[in-house]
Amino acid sequence: MTNINRLSMSTMFNALHEILNEEPLAIPPPPSRGGYSYFHIRTTEMDLQRMFNFMTGSEDLKDDISVLDTGMLMWMASFLTSDSDYFMVITRNKNGSKSLQKLMRMSDDMDVFFFVAIMRLFIHVMIDKYASYVAIQGMRIFKQDKRELMYDHILRYALFLARDQYGCIALNEIIKELDDPYYRDELMDIVSNNALLLSNDAYGNFVVQHVLKLHDSRCTGNIADKLCGYCVELSFKKYGSYIVERLLEVRDIPMATIVLDLLACKTEMLIRLARSENGNFVVCKLLELTNDILTADLFYSLVNKLRPYRFLLHRFPESKIVAILGSMRVPN
């Protein structure tokens, strides 16, 4: 489809008028499961290509659609959403996604078409790089009852989305913008209650990090509780170490949880962690932050466990740990 030469904007307007003037304007219903709908009778391959070019040919559709009357805009909304495959082709295109988002602001009647199409293809829309922004726009501007139905779907598929390359980005955007207290708390609870699963996932860990950045004390405490006993294991891993470092930045209870995990592990394991590619950053950050925050017994217990093995840490990048340990005076 994209290999066909793009038609000019004036040609597109002429084509729209030609299609609409063949007979009195009527808003076609979505296609039925059996037989042929009005949409299929009127729609030709050329019509589909013209509309595709119109929707994807410009980054700014605002001026182009400002000259269209209500009837034509309603017809466009139906045309774009009546066929699922065609709707996805438009939404997956960068400019097409932006154009649809602009059309979604035009009227509540038009938004009904877009809402139905998004809900019909919810997962496909949410895990696409550009299509997901169409759904997010819907959650901003649709009426409350429609937004709540979309939120219900988000809660149902939250863990699936969190572990998808683009789904995790969309989910983070929704968490950031969600202003309904009930749905926000429910979504945050899903993330925090599944913190261990998500922290071990290449994409899910970004969602846990995002929630920790929001500094919600209830969710942060819940995440720390779910990860208690697993901080050493996570610190060895690239993505898991990011979560542990985020918990350290929160301080207080999460930091104490991490120190207790490190103290509970065998000395051999702790030294391996301090020498590992990812774990050394966790140990170093822990030593830098805990001196003025933790109780003396916890802090010096960790220092005393590491200091006898400083000679094993004399290599890059662990040399920073050695310098920190060497600068500390540990009380007898």
Swiss-Prot record:
One GO biological-process annotation of the entry reads: regulation of translation
What is the first-listed, main subcellular location in coarse terms? cytoplasm
Stored SUPFAM superfamilies: ARM repeat
Q: Which ranges does the UniProt record give for the Pumilio repeats? A: 82-117, 118-152, 153-188, 189-225, 226-264, 265-300
Species this protein is from: Arabidopsis thaliana (Mouse-ear cress)
A Gene Ontology cellular component where this protein is annotated is: cytoplasm
Q: Which gene encodes it?
A: APUM17
The protein's job, in short, is: Sequence-specific RNA-binding protein that regulates translation and mRNA stability by binding the 3'-UTR of target mRNAs.
| Location of this chain's protein in the cell | Cytoplasm
- PROSITE patterns in the record, alphabetically? PUM, PUM_HD
Record's protein name:
Putative pumilio homolog 17
Q: Where is the signal peptide?
A: none
**UniProt-listed InterPro entries:** ARM-like, ARM-type_fold, PUM-HD, Pumilio_RNA-bd_rpt
